[in-house]
Amino acid sequence: MSQTSTLKGQCIAEFLGTGLLIFFGVGCVAALKVAGASFGQWEISVIWGLGVAMAIYLTAGVSGAHLNPAVTIALWLFACFDKRKVIPFIVSQVAGAFCAAALVYGLYYNLFFDFEQTHHIVRGSVESVDLAGTFSTYPNPHINFVQAFAVEMVITAILMGLILALTDDGNGVPRGPLAPLLIGLLIAVIGASMGPLTGFAMNPARDFGPKVFAWLAGWGNVAFTGGRDIPYFLVPLFSPIVGAIVGAFAYRKLIGRHLPCDICVVEEKETTTPSEQKASL
C-alpha cells in the first residue's frame, strides 16, 4: 500500500471497487432478465467472479480491496485491520453498490419498462420480486428463512477462509498477482454450486445497497421483504458477517497457527515506531 494512501483515498477505492463488481454482476443479471440473454448459472457465476477479480486488481494497492463489509469486519477482528477504518469502509462499499445498481438501471431503463408492460407486472407487487432480483438476492421459494441464513453463513465462511489462505504468502507458494483471479474463481465455484439456493450474496454491501435502490425505484417494501413474513434483507445483511467471522476464526485456529509466519507480523512492523526499531537493534 502506498505511504501516501489516506483514509479518503482508501474509501474512494472501496467505493469504486464495490461499484465495479456490482456493475458487471448486476449488468449480467439485467441482461438475462430483461434483454433476453441466455446465461446459465455457471456463466452468471463466472461473470460475477471475474467482476470481483477486476475490482480487486483496481483497488488492492490502495485499500486492500475488501469490497465487502463482512471481509472488513473479519479482517478487523482477526487480521489487525484498523478499527477506525471499519465504518468508513463499510459506508463506502454500500454507497458504491447503490450507485452501481442505479447506473445499471439507468442504462437498462427502457428494457425494464418494456418488460413490465409486456408481462403486466406491477412494480412493488409480490409478482415483481423476481425482477427486483436483478439488483439483489432472494431465496429459492423452497427454502425457509433459517435455511437461507445457514446457506449464506456457510458459503461466506468458506469464502473468507479461502481468501485468507490465498492471500497468505506463508501458506504454500506465494500467489501474488494470481490471487485476485483465484478469488474470482472461488466466487464462481461457490455461485455455480450454491447460487440457486440464495443467489450467493456473501456480501452485505452487494445486497443492501442495491435493495435500497430498488426500494427507491418503485419496488417499495417488497424489495426488502422479498414477499415473505420475515423481511428477507436481514439474511444477506447479517449472515455473511457471521460467516466471515467463523471462516476467519477457523482459518486462524485450524490452519494459520500451524504456519511458520503470522498474519499480523506485517501490520506489527508497520506500526513499530523508529525509536522502537532502534531499541530492538
Swiss-Prot record:
Membrane-traversing stretches: 6-34, 40-60, 85-108, 144-169, 178-194, 232-254
Periplasmic side: 35-39, 109-143, 195-198, 217-231
Membrane topology: Multi-pass membrane protein
Cytoplasmic face of the membrane: 1-5, 61-63, 79-84, 170-177, 255-281
Intramembrane segments: 64-67, 68-78, 199-202, 203-216
Keywords: Cell inner membrane, Cell membrane, Membrane, Repeat, Transmembrane, Transmembrane helix, Transport
Protein's UniProt name: Glycerol uptake facilitator protein
